Amino acid sequence: MREFTPTTLSEEERQELLGQLRRKEGRWLAWARACQTLLKNGLNPQTLFEATGFEPIQQNQITVAMQVYDSILRQDPPAHVRETYQEWGSDLLYELRELDQEQRSLCAQLALERKLDADQIREVAKATKDFCRLPKQPENFDRHPGDAVAHQCWRLAQERTDLTERSRLIARGLQFAQSAGARALIEALLLDLSGVPSRKPPMLPIYRLETEEDLPRLLPFAGTLPLSSSQIEAIAAVEAEGPFGLVSSPQGQQWLALPGWQAILTAEDPIACLEQIDRLPNAPEGPTEAVVLVVDRADRDWDADHFFLVEQAEGARIQWSPSAIAAPILGRLVLILRPKRVLDEAAIATPWQFEE
């Protein structure tokens, strides 16, 4: 079968390739190269199917298998491997598409040695892919597809309690094991005549903090307003230590834990206190309730865009002013936190009753 490089084809060359595919001249590699050439020259898969009888899924399979075959050639495989796959085996090579060149070559050889079909080589390829993804190569197992399957069987056999299933996995592992170390580990499983594997420890309950909000921030609690300036100033500044935000607590200090919201994280020296919401300037309409005020003592520069905790005659209060505040500023109001809304506590506490 005449081959064409994937450049711009003349109409005569195009018809010649279509005729060769329609008559299925040559072997699968020639078909794959013809399909690739025609597709790269603007023919769509459906039109190619109508002209040749090669379904789109078959076009894709043999084209991908051809690319796998070409990559295997770069690994200089034995002559019988090259020659065999020139004749047949596109379905086997297609299953190796997600492996690297080295593993493709080894799997292709293993498929011929073990006379594996497409379903079996798919399982081998998956085991090989999983094995190569392990952060550390398991001890006593080589980087070979056979040992990858053996490792999979060895691991699963230790988890099975059914003797029949365990025996099947051991037999399969011994069939594929390539290295002496892998074979020895699997043979050791045969010594356990009870068929009940020793119990392994459970998985560790490991979690990882993904965002700043996952890590709460502890704020020293000052009390309920109004407070004197001396009470505000007496609270020691808090500095969280380490990746988990450890806090050393002075004796007798009360604390309030809040989510790691950005407004709180950016505050340099925040403290928390309580106040009735109706006592705040520009308070929203509605029933009164106690709210948490977070105040940053490190920010004492007046700004008309913010509210401040200001020292007054009756004690510190939240204040806003369009012009500079003459009274001592004790800190900037960072946020106001309302309690969780409970719609009807009495209804929640009362069991529901239904009429028959």
Curated annotation (Swiss-Prot):
**Subunit comment:** Homodimer. Forms an RbcL(8)-Raf1(8) complex. Forms complexes of many stoichiometries with RbcL with and without RbcS. RbcX and Raf1 can bind simultaneously to RbcL.
Give me the ranges of the annotated region N-terminal alpha-helix.
Answer: 9-192
Under the heading Pfam families, the entry gives: Raf1_HTH (PF18579), Raf1_N (PF18578), RuBisCo_chap_C (PF18087)
Asked if the record carries the keyword Translocase, the reply is no
Sorted alphabetically, which keywords does the UniProt record give? Answer: Carbon dioxide fixation, Chaperone, Cytoplasm, Photosynthesis
Q: Which GO terms describe its cellular component?
A: cytoplasm
Q: What is known of its domains?
A: Has 3 domains, the N-terminal alpha-helical domain, an extended flexible linker and the C-terminal beta-sheet domain. The 2 C-terminal beta-sheet domains are swapped and pack against each other to form the dimer interface. The N-terminal alpha-helical domain stabilizes RbcL dimers and dimer-dimer interactions, facilitating RbcL(8) formation. It binds to the same region of RbcL as RbcS. The C-terminal beta-sheet domain dimerizes Raf1.
Where found in the cell?
A: Cytoplasm
Reported effect, R338A: Incomplete conversion of RbcL(2)-Raf1 to holoenzyme
Q: What is this protein called?
A: RuBisCO accumulation factor 1
Q: What is the effect of changing R155A?
A: Increases RbcL(8)-Raf1 complex formation
Q: Which domain of life is it from?
A: Bacteria
Give the GO biological process terms. Answer: carbon fixation; photosynthesis; ribulose bisphosphate carboxylase complex assembly
Q: Give the family, as the similarity comment puts it.
A: Belongs to the RAF family.
What is the species of this protein? Answer: Synechococcus elongatus (strain ATCC 33912 / PCC 7942 / FACHB-805)
